[in-house]
Structures are given as C-alpha cells and as structure tokens.
C-alpha cells in the first residue's frame, strides 16, 4: 500500500546512508526507541476519525511483526522498505493481511467492506480543504464488483491466491485492492520537510 503496487518497484537493497537517515528520523520521532499506536495515528492525522483510525490500527498491527503493540526500529525499517520499494507480491500479501481482520486466512465481504469504508473515510480526512468529489462507486458497489471479478470459486471469501491473482489480472481490481492512502508519499514528504530544517 502506499506507493503504487507495481512489478517495477522491486529494489531490495537498502543503502547504509539511507538506513542511518531512517534511524536518525526514528530516534527524533520516537525517542523511546519504539513507535506506539497513538504516534502512528498522529502521523496519519486520524485521531478524531474512528473509521480512519480503525484502518490505521490494522496497518499498525500488520507492521508490528512480534505483536508487542509497538513498532521497533527493525519493524520500522521493514515497513518502510515494503512501502517504498517492496515487490508486488510482498505488498499484496501485506495488504491481504491488513484486510483479513479476523486472521482466518480469507477475506469475506464484511471484512472487505469495513476496510473499503475506512479507506474512503481516511481519504476524506486526507483531502480536507481540497476538492471533495463523490466517488463513482459506493463502498458496497466496490466490494460487490471485486468479489464478482476475484472470487473464482464463488465461496463468498477471497483466499490469498485469489486476492493476488485477481490483482495481477485486472488493473481496476489492483487499484481498488491497493486503496492507496499514500504512506510512501507521506513518508517522502516528511523526509523532505526534515531536510529543510
């Protein structure tokens, strides 16, 4: 999520200087050495928007690999690496993990609808003061269309394989499943701002 999911974003090596820059930024932003949920929400500006906060909480949990309710520097680097230059398949697996709210290995219509609604609301928060165009499809219509195109066996659930295959086969599905809230753009903007001071 974040940067657009594309096959070409597959650079995996992290430059040592870049890693040092990330560490300096992490220490400034998180002097305790860990990033807590409330700080993560603040970064995305969603403290007062419950639907958007729900989505950001799921993103946080997906990045919190060891489940200790914090993101340490290694998890932070892994998250940035995924968002900024991860391979398509890794990004899709991570996106699937965010969408699979109950962790059962499948995404049902309710789970997908909750995420799509949260992202619609988050995009409204991110666009405050900008053109607030009404989406062409409602969240329900988006979910129904995704299931029509991706649920190959018709069981009312999307498996990881269906999710990845559906995204690869159909550009519209890819766009809808990535539901880009631009954390990569946000991260780059924060890095630019800090470089100015």
Curated annotation (Swiss-Prot):
Instruction: State where Ca(2+) 3 binds.
Output: 151, 153, 155, 157, 162
Coiled-coil spans in chain:
none
Q: Which residues form the signal peptide?
A: none
What is the tissue localization of expression for this protein?
Low expression in retina.
| Gene3D superfamilies according to UniProt | EF-hand (1.10.238.10)
Q: Which Pfam families match?
A: EF-hand_1, EF-hand_7
Q: Which positions in this protein are listed as binding Ca(2+) 1?
A: 64, 66, 68, 70, 75
Domain EF-hand, first and last residues per copy: 15-50, 51-86, 87-122, 138-173
Matching InterPro entries: EF-hand-dom_pair, EF_Hand_1_Ca_BS, EF_hand_dom, Recoverin
Which keywords belong to this entry? Calcium, Lipoprotein, Metal-binding, Myristate, Repeat, Sensory transduction, Vision
Question: What top-level branch of life does the organism fall under?
Answer: Eukaryota
Q: Does the keyword Transcription apply?
A: no
Gene Ontology annotations of biological process type:
visual perception
The entry lists its GO molecular-function terms as: calcium ion binding; calcium sensitive guanylate cyclase activator activity
Entry binding sites for Ca(2+) 2? 100, 102, 104, 106, 111
What is a single cellular component term in the Gene Ontology annotation? cone photoreceptor outer segment
Instruction: Identify where the record puts lipid attachment of type N-myristoyl glycine.
Output: 2
- Remaining remarks: Binds three calcium ions.
Entry function: Stimulates guanylyl cyclase 1 (GC1) and GC2 when free calcium ions concentration is low and inhibits guanylyl cyclases when free calcium ions concentration is elevated. This Ca(2+)-sensitive regulation of guanylyl cyclase (GC) is a key event in recovery of the dark state of rod photoreceptors following light exposure.
Q: Which PANTHER family match?
A: CALCIUM BINDING PROTEINS, GUANYLYL CYCLASE-ACTIVATING PROTEIN 2
* Protein name per the record: Guanylyl cyclase-activating protein 2
Q: Give the species.
A: Lithobates pipiens (Northern leopard frog)
């Amino acid at each position: 999520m974040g940067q657009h999911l594309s096959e070409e974003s597959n650079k995996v090596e992290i430059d040592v200087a870049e890693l040092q820059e990330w560490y300096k930024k992490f220490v400034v932003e998180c002097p305790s050495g860990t990033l807590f949920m409330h700080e993560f929400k603040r970064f995305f500006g969603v403290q007062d928007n419950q639907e958007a906060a729900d989505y950001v909480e799921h993103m946080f949990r997906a990045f919190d690999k060891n489940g200790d309710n914090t993101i340490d520097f290694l998890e932070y680097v892994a998250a940035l690496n995924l968002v900024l230059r991860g391979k398509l398949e890794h990004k899709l697996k991570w996106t699937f993990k965010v969408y699979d709210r109950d962790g059962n290995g499948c995404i049902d219509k309710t789970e997908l609808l909750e995420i799509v609604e949260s992202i619609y609301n988050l995009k409204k928060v991110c666009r405050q003061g900008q053109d607030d165009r009404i989406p062409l499809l409602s969240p329900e219509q988006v979910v129904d269309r995704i299931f029509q195109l991706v649920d190959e066996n018709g069981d009312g659930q999307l498996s990881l394989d269906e999710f990845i295959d559906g995204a690869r086969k159909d550009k519209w599905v890819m766009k809808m499943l990535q539901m880009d809230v631009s954390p990569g753009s946000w991260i780059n903007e924060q890095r630019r701002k800090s470089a100015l001071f």
